[in-house]
């Protein structure tokens, strides 16, 4: 994968994530600054997601720790847990929000 393909794939995944957050009605504020997407919660906790172009990875930092996602078999998978990116974000959002989020 070249850098252009990497950015296209990540941008599409992050847009999907933002749409899912909007559709959920959860009190989560997505803030984009450069290559970083910060999800801020009502309790002021944050999940930070960023593009790591040199490694072609997505990195996620939350109160559960740091996670790296690589694109294999047409999905972003965590190198530590094997969990798919969107599933991990959903789990972490519920931990940060301290409530069940109704994902569409």
UniProtKB/Swiss-Prot annotation:
Keywords: Iron, Metal-binding. The keyword Protein transport does not apply. It comes from the Bacteria. GO terms for molecular function: ferric iron binding; ferrous iron binding. Pfam families: Frataxin_Cyay (PF01491). Coiled coil: none annotated. Signal peptide: none annotated. GO terms for biological process: iron-sulfur cluster assembly. The keyword Transit peptide does not apply. Involved in iron-sulfur (Fe-S) cluster assembly. May act as a regulator of Fe-S biogenesis. Belongs to the frataxin family. This is Iron-sulfur cluster assembly protein CyaY.
């Amino acid at each position: 994968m070249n850098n252009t393909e990497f950015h296209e794939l990540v941008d599409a995944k992050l847009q999907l994530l933002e749409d899912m957050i909007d559709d959920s009605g959860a009190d989560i504020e997505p803030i984009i600054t450069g290559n970083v997407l910060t999800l801020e919660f009502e309790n002021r906790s944050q999940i930070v997601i960023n593009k790591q172009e040199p490694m072609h990875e997505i990195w996620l930092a939350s109160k559960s720790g740091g996670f790296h996602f690589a694109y294999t078999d047409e999905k972003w998978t965590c190198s530590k847990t094997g969990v798919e990116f969107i599933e991990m974000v959903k789990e972490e959002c519920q931990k940060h929000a301290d409530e069940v989020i109704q994902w569409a």
